[in-house]
Amino acid sequence: MTHWTIVLATEAVEKTAEGGLFDFDATLPVMAIQFLVLAALLNKLFYKPIGQAIDDRSDYIRTNLVDAKERQQKAEDLAAQYEQELRDVRREAQDVIAKAQAEAQKVVADEVKSAQAEALAEREKAALEIEAQRESAFKSLEQQVDSLSQAIASKLVGAKL
């Protein structure tokens, strides 16, 4: 068995000694044609479909990015709109509270004013009643003083006679 390997090795060395680096015979153009056919087949079966898949994927990613940016912008707009509406509602609530407080203060002020007016009227009425009673008491006293002074005068005059 070793004999055959040695024989084959010597034959291979003898054949290479004849030619140089390349043999310019019919194999070179056949190899070039084979390479071109292989390149065309690879281009047709492998590179174009992969290139198309890459382009499709790139378009898909680009479209999704644009959609995502639009959705993000829409979400930001909605958030801003929500915050503006929330501020408006809070402002309206504060206005309603302020109006209610002002109205309550007005009602309290009206009630206090009414109570003060009523108390003043009662006081004036009481003062008038007191004045009327005083006048009547003075008249009564005056009548009693007159009658008593007449009685005293009659007793004094009657005692002198």
UniProtKB/Swiss-Prot annotation:
Keyword set includes Mitochondrion: no
Q: Does the keyword Transmembrane apply?
A: yes
Q: What is the first-listed, main subcellular location in coarse terms?
A: membrane
List localization entries: Cellular thylakoid membrane
Pfam families to which the protein is assigned, alphabetical? ATP-synt_B
Q: Per its database record, what is this protein's job? A: F(1)F(0) ATP synthase produces ATP from ADP in the presence of a proton or sodium gradient. F-type ATPases consist of two structural domains, F(1) containing the extramembraneous catalytic core and F(0) containing the membrane proton channel, linked together by a central stalk and a peripheral stalk. During catalysis, ATP synthesis in the catalytic domain of F(1) is coupled via a rotary mechanism of the central stalk subunits to proton translocation. Component of the F(0) channel, it forms part of the peripheral stalk, linking F(1) to F(0). The b'-subunit is a diverged and duplicated form of b found in plants and photosynthetic bacteria.
- Name the record gives this protein: ATP synthase subunit b'
Q: Which organism is it from?
A: Picosynechococcus sp. (strain ATCC 27264 / PCC 7002 / PR-6) (Agmenellum quadruplicatum)
